[in-house]
Regions:
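S-adenosylmethionine
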Residues: 1-437
Length: 437
């Protein structure tokens, strides 16, 4: 068996699952269950498969440049396998061309692409010749089209980002969408403290550092084979939560004895953070309309040994009708709204290809309904925090501005927008803090 064949085959299988509509992280998990790879193999497979997903448009340009048949006419299975080979040749500098080609061709030979192994070999070898001669695909000189091609983003999305932040910042954000995302943990301060847990990780030869300005944030500096096999998982000493997301719950400043609503709670990283900040001594109602996601939340609550949270399967936009006793009941409300997730494209590489302007418009309508529906549940002296993991202003500050204009009795106390940056870790995030006048 050619060295590296299984890793390429697994990566190709991930692309096939993603093309069928499975989320990239779920596809990775499903495929890895069928193999026994070590941590280095898993890191390689993750980089290769997720890189192919991110750079789909860029890799298609190279297929069009080096093949007689354009990418749109390639059989899908062949197209994705060509992406596996091309990504290694174009984006993975440490892999020799010969190894990239031979291992990728071997996948074709040992699967139902056997009859096309010669085609794979020819296209990849032709690509090497083009690389060596610096004969690259012709890319438009138009800045937006060029950025779309080089950073492999839908052109409609690039136009939107440029409209939001300008071309210079858009280039930085586009690069950030293609970098390897950080893996951040939030320490469960109900059970341990940051320095103690860092020492525990160091004893296990796990490279991790504290995140500045976050009381309980830790960054893992290398990919573990399985996140659940890290020390302290079973004991509930930590949860996975991006550093930008860890800014949200503290804005609400949950206190002992307060009644708190998390209106879109599952899978629960912010719910458990609220409980943690209130020393597990608040009355927290976690609402979500997905029973499956609520089960994940309940599992997290049990693992972290959090007792102050009760869950409710419901649509938060209907809470006033189904639970009228909750009107003016809550001291604090968190709406971590369903959103386009544009701030997390590095972490969710397939999202860029499934998003559309129409989907965003539908989400905006839902976000507006959530704000209008949940506001009556807040006490007159209460605080509401609205958050998203997007950088789209129509879902963020523009939406909040319209909400304030419509509801004259409330005011904006503060808002924060975090943009993804190529040279800094962290997702894009937005949060607004609102209260009655």
């Amino acid at each position: 068996m050619i060295k590296g064949y299984l890793q390429r085959k697994a990566s190709w299988e991930i692309l096939l699952k993603v093309s069928s509509g499975i989320y990239s992280d779920h596809a990775l998990e499903k495929v890895l269950k069928n193999y026994e790879f070590n941590s280095l193999d898993i890191a390689f497979i993750t980089e290769l498969s997720f890189g192919c997903i991110r750079y789909r448009k860029f890799l298609d340009l190279w297929i069009d440049h080096t093949s007689k048949l354009p990418h749109v006419k390639q059989p899908p299975k062949l197209r994705w396998l060509l992406h596996i080979g091309l990504y290694q040749l174009l984006k993975m500098d440490k892999i020799p061309f010969s190894a990239a080609i031979s291992s990728t061709v071997e996948v074709a030979k040992k699967t139902d692409l056997k009859g096309l192994a010669g085609t794979v070999n020819a296209i990849l070898r032709n690509t090497v010749r083009h690389i060596e001669k610096e004969n690259v695909p012709k890319i438009s000189s138009d800045e937006i089209e060029r950025l779309s091609s080089l950073e492999s983003l839908p052109i409609w999305l690039v136009k939107e980002i440029v409209n939001w932040v300008g071309i210079k910042e858009a280039k930085n954000i586009a690069k950030a969408f293609n970098k390897k995302p950080s893996i951040d943990l939030r320490i469960n301060s109900l059970k341990t403290d940051l320095n103690k847990f860092l020492n525990e990780l160091a004893e296990c030869n796990i490279n991790a550092t504290a995140i500045s300005q976050l009381k309980n944030g830790i960054a893992l500096n290398s990919n573990p084979r399985s996140i659940k096999k890290l020390p302290g998982y079973r004991d509930g000493l930590w949860v996975v939560q991006d550093r930008s997301s860890q800014w949200v719950a503290p804005l609400l400043n949950p206190m002992k004895g307060e009644k708190i609503l998390d209106a879109c709670s599952a899978p629960g990283s912010k719910t458990t953070h609220l409980a943690q900040l209130a020393n597990d001594d608040a009355e927290i109602l976690a609402v979500d309309r997905s029973e499956k996601r609520l089960k994940i939340l309940q599992s997290n609550l049990e693992r972290l040994n959090i007792k102050s949270v009760k869950t409710l399967k419901a649509d938060a936009t209907n809470l006033v009708d189904i639970k009228p006793n909750l009107i003016s009941y809550f001291d604090k409300i968190l709406i971590d709204a369903p959103c386009s997730g544009i701030g997390t494209l590095a972490r969710n590489p397939d999202s860029r290809w499934s998003l559309s302007k129409d989907k965003i418009n539908q989400l905006i309508l839902l976000q507006e309904r959530l704000l209008e529906s949940v506001l009556p549940l807040l006490k007159r002296n209460g605080t509401l925090v609205y958050s998203t993991c997007t950088i789209c202003p129509e879902e963020n500050n523009f939406l909040i501005k319209r909400f304030l204009t419509k509801n004259k009795e409330i005011k904006l106390d503060s808002e924060k927008q975090i943009l993804p940056k190529f040279d800094e870790p962290g997702d894009g995030f937005y949060a607004a803090k609102i209260s009655y006048k």
